[in-house]
């Protein structure tokens, strides 16, 4: 497995991202150890909250949520998934599998010895995080999902997703900043778009981002389907607090909160919300998300 690391110089002086870098080695069952980057802010003895990003972003997505959550007393941890941000990046699309991503995040939880954590997930963060919660639930006390879901290959896949999947694999460019800007309500300034582009100096660093759409299980014979269906069944027995906060302007996932709220017992009586945001709800409404989490006791 060939691995690249984005040069540190790419992350200097990014707008709104003054956080110190932390690293830990993680491994999947069938991979060597890889270096995973994460943010660790707020009081070390505060209740941990883990913020898990998705495609094609990194912990930069949480830059407006981290300070208020830390000020609210949380120990705020935001990892970069393998292939993203400042984490190691295997160079082949085939190096990435759904199971490996789940195992890398589980390994990260174990290395940090996290317990009683609040887990906030969005986009691919939910595809990974909901599996982790279902399979490693003793580390997680509360779940928050924003514009995410757990695919089980039941039902029709929108044509728009097939187009996105082909674009991600075959397009000569994968402009992360412009993709984020296309999924927000508010205008994303060029300097912020540059922050999303920072991890990807050229195509050799993009295999992880190009792989993610290919890994969404949309066919019943996908190797991830059995584990996802088992995780969905386990979430049907999840009685710990569960909160859904969705951006209602998201054309694909704006209503994906409904099956989650209906299925998960811990969702009953919680202050779920749909707010004026698009898919990248953290970019549109980061401080509001932080405030809703802080007030959710």
Swiss-Prot record:
Keyword terms of this UniProt record: Hydrolase
Active site per the UniProt annotation: 123 (nucleophile), 250 (proton donor), 279 (proton acceptor)
InterPro entries for this protein: AB_hydrolase_1 (IPR000073), AB_hydrolase_fold (IPR029058), Epox_hydrolase-like (IPR000639), Haloalkane_dehalogenase (IPR051340), Haloalkane_dehalogenase_1 (IPR023489)
EC number: 3.8.1.5
Intrachain S-S bonds: none
Catalytic activity field: 1-haloalkane + H2O = a halide anion + a primary alcohol + H(+)
GO MF terms held by the record: epoxide hydrolase activity; haloalkane dehalogenase activity
Residue ranges occupied by any AB hydrolase-1 domain in the UniProt entry: 47-148
Top-level taxon of the source organism: Bacteria
Keyword Ubl conjugation: no
Function: Catalyzes hydrolytic cleavage of carbon-halogen bonds in halogenated aliphatic compounds, leading to the formation of the corresponding primary alcohols, halide ions and protons.
Family: Belongs to the haloalkane dehalogenase family. Type 1 subfamily.
Quaternary structure and interacting proteins, as annotated: Monomer.
Stated name of the protein: Haloalkane dehalogenase
Gene assigned in the entry: dhmA
């Amino acid at each position: 497995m060939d691995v690249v690391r984005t040069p540190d110089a790419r992350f200097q002086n990014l707008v709104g991202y003054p956080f110190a870098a932390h690293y830990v080695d993680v491994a999947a069952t069938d991979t060597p150890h890889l270096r995973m980057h994460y943010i660790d802010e707020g009081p070390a003895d505060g209740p941990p909250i883990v913020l898990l990003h998705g495609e094609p972003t990194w912990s930069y997505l949480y830059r407006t949520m981290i300070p208020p959550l830390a000020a609210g007393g949380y120990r705020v941890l935001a990892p970069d998934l393998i292939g993203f941000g400042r984490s190691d990046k295997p160079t082949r699309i085939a190096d990435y599998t759904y199971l490996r991503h789940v195992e890398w995040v589980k390994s990260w939880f174990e290395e940090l010895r996290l317990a009683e954590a609040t887990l906030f997930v969005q986009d691919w963060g939910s595809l990974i995080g909901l599996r982790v919660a279902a399979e490693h639930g003793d580390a997680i006390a509360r779940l928050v999902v924003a514009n995410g879901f757990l695919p089980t290959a039941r039902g029709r896949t929108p044509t728009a997703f097939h187009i996105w999947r082909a674009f991600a694999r075959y397009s000569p460019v994968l402009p992360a900043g412009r993709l984020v800007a296309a999924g927000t309500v508010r205008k994303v300034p060029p300097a912020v778009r540059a922050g999303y582009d920072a991890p990807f100096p050229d195509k050799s660093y993009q295999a992880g981002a190009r792989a993610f759409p290919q890994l969404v299980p949309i066919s019943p014979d996908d190797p991830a389907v059995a584990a996802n269906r088992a995780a969905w069944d386990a979430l049907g027995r999840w009685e710990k607090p569960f909160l859904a906060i969705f951006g209602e302007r998201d054309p694909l996932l704006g209503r994906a909160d409904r099956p989650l709220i209906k299925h998960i017992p811990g969702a009953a009586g919680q202050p779920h919300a749909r707010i004026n945001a698009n898919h990248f709800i953290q970019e549109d409404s980061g401080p509001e998300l932080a405030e809703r989490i802080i007030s959710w006791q």
